[in-house]
Structure formats: C-alpha cells, structure tokens
Regions:
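Transition-metal
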Residues: 1-107
Length: 107
C-alpha cells in the first residue's frame, strides 16, 4: 500500500516522432523538441507496456504509473479498477499534414 496522501502529481511527457509530426508541440506548448521537426505526439499520461508516465514531483517522484497501480490500485484508480492498468492515454498531437483514419478496435 502507498502510505503517501494523494496529491496533484506531474508526469514527464513522452515525445513521439513520426513523418507527419511538426514543431508546434514545442513552440506552442513548450514541450521538449527533438530538433528534427517531426514531433508528432506528446503522451502526457500513459500506462502502456514499456511506455510509462514517470512522476516528476513530490514524495513519489521517479515512480511510474504502472508501479503505483501495482502497489495500490485503489490509490490511483479508486473503485474503477480496470485490469491493473490506467485506462486512458492522454496526449497532444501535432499533425503537420492530413492524416488517414486510424482505428484501433482491439484497444
């Protein structure tokens, strides 16, 4: 169990580059830039395999979201526990060109 009282946590964003990305995530939102002009996604909160949000502030700094959920699922998820992982992926996109429809029926 996590003995720490809940507090507003900040997470380090994960930056993803693609051929359709741009520079707006860094210029408009101040996100770290790769310097290649193809920064497409800033994953703000994620618990998906090896892609993990890491707490950057407070007593739990350095812990991943998956670590916190495995230690004490109800501390993060409350009574809405869903298969042991955080149920949402929160991200910003910079689509520097028109994209095709993307469907993820199994997710």
């Amino acid at each position: 169990m996590i003995s720490q009282e809940p507090y507003p946590m900040r997470f380090h964003p994960l930056m993803k580059q693609t051929i359709w990305g741009g520079e707006k995530l860094s210029t408009l939102l101040g996100k770290p830039a790769s310097g290649h002009g193809n920064d497409a996604e800033s994953w703000e909160i994620v618990d998906h395999g090896d892609d993990q949000s890491v707490v950057t502030n407070g007593a739990l700094a350095g812990s991943t979201l998956a670590d916190l959920i495995s230690q004490d699922p109800s501390w993060i998820l409350g009574s809405s526990q869903t298969e042991g992982q955080f149920p949402l992926l929160l991200k910003f996109l910079d689509c520097n060109c028109v994209l095709s429809v993307q469907v993820h029926p199994d997710d």
